[in-house]
């Protein structure tokens, strides 16, 4: 299959630039994965589509303020650092701009000098391995000095950092939010529990590769980025029990879905586990664990729209996207939601 088979027309004004004031009042498109039938709802109506005995799987990762603005020690030239993933205690794979100023041995200063960095190696696709020096706890220093690494298509400034976190975020480590989870409020989660639906958590730290378009002509040749995941025994047991009892396992977001399918493909069921996954799902993939998916509207030709197309069917998904454009849904990270059931 070709990447262009997953293309669609999107007017720029439909790319949401800011989150809604009330998380659960965004629009919700409900797509029947077998028939392609579409319904238009509000997100809090998701409650009507969840049944007692179902299990909702959420990703509790927390976005790091991973964008650092600093200067080169020698020249005082302005530099931008974007932390991608931790490779050791104080060492990170990092995107550095402008890259030509970031040679091995180059040193940089952030804030009033409370954070320093040195490039100690080169990594794939032009990123650098950077070692940081600081006093105290790195996460606290980052909280003071760092900015939220918003996707490139969001050009407006985010006034409140917490708007780019889910209400249940806990485990810091992501370079982007698991955006399907942004629509849930504490109140909605409580109502879901009261209805007899199990809510469980896993962790997958979202990397910037999630925004990378598929450049290869044939999608089968695309090399997927790796992301770290972790799942507890308690979560694994509840998911397996749900499947055995005939309930649905509903992934909240493509990140939860990727973790579930990684484990299903490796072990045939969900077990306590942690590691790295580069699973790539596109039409023809047979789902092992995920029965339904809550997700946002994704970029044309992205691996994420391919994943959704694998769960339903390419034509059905592209037709639903065409309807969403016509009905002026809001797209991408701060946009509206879709429930593929």
From Swiss-Prot:
The keyword S-adenosyl-L-methionine applies. It catalyses: 7-aminomethyl-7-carbaguanosine(34) in tRNA + S-adenosyl-L-methionine = epoxyqueuosine(34) in tRNA + adenine + L-methionine + 2 H(+). It is found in: Cytoplasm. One of its GO terms (cellular component) is cytoplasm. InterPro entries: QueA, QueA_dom1, QueA_dom2, QueA_sf. GO terms for molecular function: S-adenosylmethionine:tRNA ribosyltransferase-isomerase activity. Its main location: cytoplasm. Coiled coil: none annotated. Its EC number is 2.4.99.17. One of its GO terms (biological process) is queuosine biosynthetic process. Pathway: tRNA modification; tRNA-queuosine biosynthesis. PANTHER family: S-ADENOSYLMETHIONINE:TRNA RIBOSYLTRANSFERASE-ISOMERASE (PTHR30307:SF0). Belongs to the QueA family. Transfers and isomerizes the ribose moiety from AdoMet to the 7-aminomethyl group of 7-deazaguanine (preQ1-tRNA) to give epoxyqueuosine (oQ-tRNA). Monomer. This is S-adenosylmethionine:tRNA ribosyltransferase-isomerase. It comes from Clostridium tetani (strain Massachusetts / E88).
């Amino acid at each position: 299959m070709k990447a262009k088979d997953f293309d669609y027309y999107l007017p720029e004004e439909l790319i949401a630039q800011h989150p809604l004031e009330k998380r659960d009042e965004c629009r919700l498109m409900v797509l029947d994965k077998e028939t392609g039938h579409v319904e238009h709802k509000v997100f809090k109506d998701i409650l009507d589509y969840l049944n007692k005995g179902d299990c909702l799987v959420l990703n509790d990762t927390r976005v790091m303020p991973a964008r650092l603005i600093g200067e080169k020690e020698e020249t005082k030239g302005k530099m931008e650092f974007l932390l991608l993933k931790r490779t050791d205690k104080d060492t990170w794979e990092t995107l550095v701009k402008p890259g030509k100023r970031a040679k091995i041995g180059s040193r940089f200063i952030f804030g009033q000098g409370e954070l320093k960095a040195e490039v100690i190696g080169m990594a794939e696709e032009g990123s650098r391995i950077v070692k940081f020096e600081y006093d105290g706890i790195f996460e606290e220093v980052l909280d003071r000095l760092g900015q939220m690494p918003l996707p490139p298509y969001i050009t407006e400034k985010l006034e409140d950092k917490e708007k780019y976190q889910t209400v249940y975020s806990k485990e810091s480590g992501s370079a982007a939010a698991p955006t399907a989870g942004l629509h849930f409020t504490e109140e909605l989660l409580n109502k879901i529990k009261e209805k007899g639906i199990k809510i469980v958590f896993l962790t997958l730290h979202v990397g910037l590769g999630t925004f990378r378009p598929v450049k290869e002509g044939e999608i089968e040749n695309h090399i997927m980025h790796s992301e770290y995941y972790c799942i507890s025994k308690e979560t694994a047991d509840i998911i397996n029990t749900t499947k055995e009892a005939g309930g649905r396992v509903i992934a909240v977001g493509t990140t939860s879905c990727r973790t579930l399918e990684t484990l299903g493909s490796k072990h045939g069921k969900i077990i306590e586990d942690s590691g790295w996954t580069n699973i790539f799902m596109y039409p023809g993939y047979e789902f092992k664990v995920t029965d339904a998916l809550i997700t946002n509207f994704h970029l044309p030709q992205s691996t994420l729209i391919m994943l959704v197309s694998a769960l339903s069917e390419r034509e059905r998904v592209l037709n639903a996207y065409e309807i969403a454009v016509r009905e002026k849904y809001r797209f991408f990270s701060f946009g509206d939601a879709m429930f593929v059931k």
